[in-house]
Design a protein with these regions (language model features):
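Active-site-adjacent structural elements that line small-molecule/cofactor binding pockets in enzymes
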Residues: 1-307
């Protein structure tokens, strides 16, 4: 929140998004208040990013049980939107009860509403989700979807059924789901070696971001056409050979998951992303300094405008 408040004060037009806030670490009302405060500071430019994280982080770092991530996410979204409408919050879900039932506390809780007036009564919510049930819920309820290890070629096979299921239940008055993907950007001849910068992060998530038996990122990578590689990377990483795990990341994946290469190649990747359903780009720019990164941003914008 501190960093987002700073950015809100220093900018005028860009959307200020929270990244991915784990739903277990804050109450739904606090998540709603955080987004409402940011929306006020930014004059209506906030986006609330939410995710369930995973059991190793929630239980190992936060000391909380990792239970019912999809159902909890659904309830959090419902409560946040109730708060933003400045209704007296009353919610009796399976995981959140507001006010707290009298037999579980002092009995003094009563329905309350947000004192401040948000700029908007429906702040956009982006959900980071990967599994079938969570992606379906995202397509049904959220405003935007933040996938990981997205490649245009595998997207429909991995997530298509879930997206169609969720979109079939989506409220008619909510705008179509905004799908974010893209990766690192470096447009020009001879840029291909910059793809290797993604190896450490990819190896960490595929190999070590979760237990061997429950690593969501490894599952997605495997389903994306890299089943053998996913197992090798995980084995190497968990054995402590991180360098070998990084080297085992397929060059083919690094090319498909980024926008790095000659202008023609990047334009082809943009077409592929659009055809797979991507509606917004989630990217980072390569460059030695701010000027180089700004130039890459301008290059990408020109290519997008030319599609």
């Amino acid at each position: 929140p501190t960093a987002m408040g700073y950015l809100a004060a220093e900018t005028e037009r860009v959307i200020i998004a929270s990244g991915i806030l784990p739903i277990y670490t804050r109450t739904p009302s606090l998540l709603a208040m955080t987004a409402a405060g940011l929306d006020y500071l930014s004059d209506g430019r906030a986006m609330l990013g939410l995710g369930a994280s995973g059991p190793q982080v929630i239980e190992g770092f936060h000391g909380l049980p990792y239970t019912a991530p999809v159902a909890r996410t659904r309830e959090v979204i419902d409560i946040c939107r109730q708060v933003w409408r400045r209704e007296k919050v009353q919610y009796m879900g399976d995981h959140y009860q507001i006010p707290l039932p009298q037999d579980r506390g002092t009995g003094l809780g009563k329905p309350l509403k947000l004192i401040n007036h948000p700029v908007r009564s429906d702040i956009p919510i982006a959900i980071a989700s990967l599994g079938p049930a969570s992606v379906a819920a995202t397509a049904e309820l959220a405003d935007a979807w933040l996938p990981a290890f997205y490649t245009a070629e595998a997207a429909d096979a991995v997530w298509g059924d879930s997206l169609r299921k969720g979109n079939g239940k989506r409220a008619g008055d909510r705008s179509p789901l905004d799908i974010y993907a893209g990766g690192s950007v470096a447009i020009g001849e001879g840029m291909e070696p910059l793809r290797d910068r993604a190896r450490p992060g990819a190896a960490l998530y595929i190999g070590g971001m979760g237990a061997r038996s429950k690593n969501f990122y490894n599952d997605i990578f495997s389903k994306s056409g890299y089943e053998a590689e996913a197992k090798i990377i995980q084995d190497l990483y968990l054995a402590g050979d991180k360098k070998a795990a990084e080297e085992a990341i397929p060059d083919d994946y690094l090319a498909k998951s980024s926008l790095i290469g000659p202008e023609g190649f990047v334009k082809e990747r943009l077409y592929a992303l659009r055809e797979s359903g991507v509606t917004s780009l989630n990217v980072s720019f390569a460059g030695a300094d701010a000027a180089e990164r700004a130039a890459q941003c301008e290059n990408l914008r020109n290519l997008v405008d030319s599609l």
